[in-house]
Design a protein with these regions (language model features):
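Conserved acidic donor-binding segment of nucleotide-sugar-dependent glycosyltransferases
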Residues: 119-128, 136-141
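Conserved donor-binding/catalytic core segment of Leloir-type glycosyltransferases
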Residues: 1-14, 20-23, 36
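Nucleotide-activated donor-binding/catalytic signature segment of Leloir-type glycosyltransferases, i.e.
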Residues: 48-66
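Short alpha-helical donor nucleotide-sugar binding micro-motif in glycosyltransferases
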Residues: 65-66, 73-78
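Short glycine/serine-rich donor-binding loops of glycosyltransferases
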Residues: 91-94, 112
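Short hydrophobic beta-strand element within catalytic cores of glycosyltransferases
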Residues: 103-106
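A charged, aromatic-enriched C-terminal amphipathic alpha-helix characteristic of glycosyltransferases
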Residues: 142-172
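Aromatic "clamp/platform" in nucleotide-sugar-dependent glycosyltransferases that forms part
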Residues: 86
């Protein structure tokens, strides 16, 4: 089975219900996919209930809170990472996923959407687009491999010193 993962706090800010809704749509048309919700938070019970009501509990796994090495083990065992955040000043987890060679789907509302070129971006509320992106990444190996390779190159080139130099150049042009 392919594994599609949500990893983060299970809170309203992170948009876990959109992940579940998109997963439900994918599972209506596609077999051989498992979904993982890794983390904990005040919406955990609500998400477990939603998964049960959607009748997809047999394809869903809740890990609870992960730390340190467990996070990277989870990412490395994933085929796709999804960050459907409603509000996210930056969001470093897609970079961690991409560094592990895992293509990412992120919300356009996250800060990292402004800098990542090789992640698929959807509006957090557009569960149809999110489901389409999930389906595409597990169904089209060429697309998956392209985003895996380009994403890895992209995150390996994100260096704080380069970002600082670019920021300084912008500042110098303005002054």
């Amino acid at each position: 089975d392919k594994v599609i993962t949500f990893l983060g706090r299970i809170t309203m800010q992170k948009g876990p219900e959109y992940f579940v809704e998109a997963a439900h749509k994918v599972l209506q048309h596609t077999d051989g996919i498992r979904f993982v919700m890794a983390g904990n938070g005040d919406m955990m019970d609500k998400m477990i209930d939603l998964v049960a009501r959607k009748r997809i509990a047999d394809r869903f796994h809740f890990t609870g809170f992960l730390r340190g090495r467990q996070v990277y083990e989870m990412l490395r065992s994933s085929d796709v990472y999804v960050m459907p955040s409603v509000s996210e000043p930056f969001g470093i987890s897609p970079l961690e996923a991409m560094q592990c060679g895992v293509p990412s789907i992120i919300s356009k509302q996250s800060g990292c959407a402004e800098i990542l070129r090789y992640a698929i971006k959807t509006d957090y509320w557009d569960v149809d687009a999110m489901a389409d992106a999930m389906h595409a990444l597990v169904s089209y190996p060429t697309l998956h491999e392209h985003l895996k390779q380009k994403g890895l190159e992209e995150v390996n080139n994100i260096v704080w010193s380069k970002a600082g130099l670019r920021l300084r150049a912008i500042y110098d042009r303005l002054v």
